[in-house]
From Swiss-Prot, chain A:
Part of the ABC transporter complex TcyJKLMN involved in L-cystine import. Probably responsible for the translocation of the substrate across the membrane. Is also involved in cystathionine, djenkolate, and S-methylcysteine transport. This is L-cystine transport system permease protein TcyL. The chain crosses the membrane at residues 25-45, 69-89, 96-116, 196-216. Its main location: membrane. GO terms for molecular function: transmembrane transporter activity. It is a multi-pass membrane protein. Residues 21-216 form the ABC transmembrane type-1 domain. It comes from Bacillus subtilis (strain 168). The gene is tcyL.
Curated annotation (Swiss-Prot), chain B:
This is L-cystine import ATP-binding protein TcyN. The gene is tcyN. Its EC number is 7.4.2.-. It holds the Pfam family ABC_tran. It comes from Bacillus subtilis (strain 168). CDD domains: ABC_HisP_GlnQ. It comes from the Bacteria. Induction: More strongly expressed in the presence of methionine than in the presence of sulfate. The keyword Membrane applies. Belongs to the ABC transporter superfamily. L-cystine importer (TC 3.A.1.3.13) family.
Length: 239, 259
């Protein structure tokens, strides 16, 4: 039974929910870390057009970008025990936290791969040629010359990915993870004040997202300071 | 020292190089001139295998590389003997001037950082940029960028320096400072192959001038032979058109017959 709207409850809920923010951030950090590394390995065959692996990467990316994150969560959550069961390991009692991290990592990898690929594509081919011309090997040219510039190019998109991934983690409660949203669900059950809980949740998520956005904006400015870019009239301060 | 035999290159149906032969002795300056699309840049890029010829042989120091199927090792080896200066500079945008010059030393040649720094600083002094060591490419003028490009190529002490139209992208006012640096390099006795539109430069510093058109070498020889005692009509036509006087010549006389 829903109770009458009570503004004061929001203020009470915010600190209760914020106490679970570390869990949310933990899922986010781990999944971004693993996702980024996996994304790099997915991007490489796409960039270098390596036969077969390229097709597999394409299918992988397309699948994870084309299915809802909640469906992916359940597939991984039920899929891991089913898979490990085949080799006789029982993981059905596994903490759903790990399934959530795995899902978000797999999903972030698909997004990261496309972002990295676009970043590498935006680096002038001449950079690679110049690296070759002074005797760098293919991998040296990629690691030392192309990738650093590609990551700078990709940085704004990475920022967007982090923020959208933060919002995605709010679905982890559906497989029973006790993160901020999970705690929100239990608060609703115990208090019968759904609206207040959701408003409190939105306040915390929004605050974190704004903080991230600010951080990425400042970081981007610092990183781009030394990069070559074409200065247009739009960059000039005309008063 | 360098012998290049029968280089062929095709882009799709477009036959860009139709069997180029060239011998370059140690300390020689070879300039390649010719109209756009004649294949001169492609030929130069074949020499460090940035472009893979369909056929041909490059030998340096008695080491013979079959360009059709070079091994990774051969490609890498060849690139270590050569260095290229690009029309669009291609400085590493995320590295400072000194880091740009050090890169080929510390990474490709495993030189110690302090030693590489000393070499790079010295090369940058030669091109007059000793006070820009810590600047980023985006903070330099075109002429300064190209001088860094030259220092980067010089630093690795290649057997042969390849210049791909090094002044073509520069403001007219900045061409001089780059050519000046190149003249200094000529004086050191470096082996150079230069693709250029700077005819006066070609005329004055070359030991050998090569005129290319439509994928073949039309004419080659000393500057005296090519510029003064031109043998082929196509060369004469090209030289006339690039000469400053061309614009003011009475055009009625040189109209080509319409077939």
């Amino acid at each position: 039974m829903e109770k009458a709207f009570d503004m004061n409850m929001i203020g009470d809920f915010v600190p209760t929910l914020t106490a679970y923010l570390p869990v949310t951030l933990y899922i986010l950090t781990l999944s971004l870390l693993f996702g980024f590394v996996l994304g790099l390995f997915l991007a490489l065959p796409r960039i270098y057009n390596i036969p077969i692996v390229n097709q597999l990467a394409k299918v992988y990316i397309s699948f994870f970008r084309g299915t809802p994150i909640m469906v992916q969560l359940f597939i991984v959550f039920y899929g891991i025990p089913a898979l490990t069961g085949l080799i006789g390991i029982d993981t059905s009692k596994m903490d759903p936290f790990y399934a959530a991290v795995a899902t978000y990592a797999l999903s972030n990898a698909a997004a990261a791969a496309e972002i990295i690929r676009a970043g590498v594509g935006s680096v002038d081919k001449g950079q690679t040629e110049a690296a070759y011309s002074i005797g760098l090997s293919g991998s040296q040219a990629f690691r030392r010359i192309v990738l650093p510039q590609a990551l700078v190019q990709a940085f704004p998109n990475m920022g967007n990915m982090v923020i959208s991934s933060l919002k995605d983690t709010s679905l982890a409660f559906s497989i029973g993870v006790m993160d901020m949203s999970g705690r929100g669900q239990t608060l609703i059950t115990s208090s019968n004040h759904s609206l207040e809980v959701y408003i409190a949740l939105s306040i915390v998520y929004y605050a974190v997202a704004v903080l991230f956005e600010w951080f990425f904006r400042v970081a981007e400015k610092r990183i781009k300071k030394n990069q070559t870019r074409i200065v247009t009239v739009f960059d000039m301060n005309i008063h | 020292m360098i012998e290049i035999k029968n280089i062929h290159k095709q882009f799709g149906i477009h036959h860009v190089l139709k069997g180029i032969n060239l011998t370059v002795r140690k300390g020689e300056v070879v300039t390649i001139i010719g109209p756009s699309g004649s294949g001169k840049t492609t030929f130069l890029r074949c020499l460090n295998l940035l472009e893979r010829p369909d056929e041909g042989i490059i030998s340096i120091h008695d080491k013979v590389i079959n360009c059709r199927f070079p091994s990774k090792k051969e490609v890498h080896w060849l690139r270590k003997q050569t260095a290229m200066v690009f029309q669009q500079y291609h400085l590493f945008a995320h590295k400072t001037v000194i880091e740009n010059v050090m890169e080929g030393l510390t990474i490709a040649r495993k030189m110690r950082k302090q030693d590489a720094y000393a070499v790079a600083e010295n090369e940058l002094r030669k091109v007059g940029l000793q006070d820009k060591l810590n600047a980023y490419p985006s903070q330099l003028s075109g002429g300064q960028k190209q001088r860094v490009g030259i220092a980067r190529a010089l630093a690795i002490h290649p057997d042969v320096l390849l210049f791909d139209e090094p002044t073509a992208a520069l403001d007219p006012e900045l061409v001089g400072e780059v050519l000046e640096v190149m003249l200094e390099i000529v004086k050191t006795g470096a082996t150079m192959i230069v693709v250029t539109h700077e005819m006066e430069f070609a005329r004055r510093v070359s030991d050998q001038v090569v005129f290319m058109d439509e994928g073949v070498i039309v004419e080659q020889g000393t500057p005296e032979e090519v510029f003064r005692h031109t043998k082929k009509d196509r060369t004469r036509q090209f030289l006339r058109r690039v000469s400053p006087e061309y614009l003011f010549e009475p055009k009625e006389h040189i109209k080509e017959p319409v077939i």
